[in-house]
Regions:
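Acidic, PIN/NYN-like endoribonuclease modules and their adjacent C-terminal/linker elements
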Residues: 19-24
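Conserved PLP-enzyme active-site core in the AAT-like
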Residues: 1-6, 10-12, 27-28, 32-33, ...
Length: 228
């Protein structure tokens, strides 16, 4: 029975293998372009000037993910920390976050202030609003349009379904939502929580209009980086 099931999934496995190979080539090409060498692999605290390893890996990540720049350093301890950093760096008192893929991960609730927490964005006068996905897992475009207001500064999209039962969002679907949002206000910052999403498709949200993508080295890009 198991062999029959595996045969039935042959086409799907071949598609996944092709995506993996394409992304592997993308990473290898970037490593060659930035001349990643043994000198970049030495131990470091991540502090100080002229940290060639840090500078090289950040240039590598920016190239692979098609972004202007990247922050990849040991001071960022986890995905939630990275998300909190991205939010706090781009929001000021009076601004509003609009989450258009429903409630974010539980770990982000205290960062935003959905659950009361000292030092939350809410404590600093940054408000939060949310538009849930429709029953079929698609974006509620009418709801998004109605929710965007003069205070809206940053659009939050969570690619992975996390602990919910909704479908995970594809890059193309995210791109359509970003285009819709930018038509309403081109100055809105769109941040995609890309945790679990790296390298599972041929392109990343940064290639379809996302202003920031945030991930975690404990997940897909980390590979063998995280010690057990």
């Amino acid at each position: 029975y198991a062999q029959e099931v595996e045969k039935g999934l042959k086409d799907r496995f071949e598609t996944l293998d092709a995506i993996a190979q394409l992304n592997q080539i993308k990473v290898l090409n970037a490593m060659q372009k930035h001349q990643i060498a043994e000198m970049h692999l030495g131990g470091t605290t991540g502090y100080g000037y002229n940290d060639s390893g840090r500078e090289a890996v950040e240039a590598l990540y920016a190239d692979v993910f098609g972004t202007e720049d990247a922050l990849v350093r040991p001071q960022i301890t986890c995905g939630t920390h990275a998300l909190g950093l991205a939010l706090s760096a781009n929001l000021r008192p009076g601004d509003e976050i609009l989450a258009i893929s429903g409630k974010p991960y539980d770990t982000l609730e205290e960062v935003i202030g959905i659950r009361e927490s000292k030092g939350s964005l809410k404590e600093y006068g940054i408000t939060y609003a949310q538009v849930d996905l429709l029953e079929d897992g698609s974006f509620d475009l009418e709801g998004i349009k109605n929710a965007i207001n003069d205070k809206t500064k940053l659009i939050h999209i969570q690619r992975s379904k996390g602990y919910a039962t909704r479908p995970t969002l594809s890059v193309d679907v995210i791109g359509e939502a970003i285009a819709f949002v930018k038509e309403i206000n081109k100055d809105l910052i769109v941040m995609v929580d890309n945790c679990y999403g790296e390298f599972v498709e041929e392109k990343e949200p940064s290639e379809v209009g996302a202003d920031m993508i945030v991930g975690s080295l404990i997940k897909n890009p980390g590979g063998g980086l995280a010690p057990i």
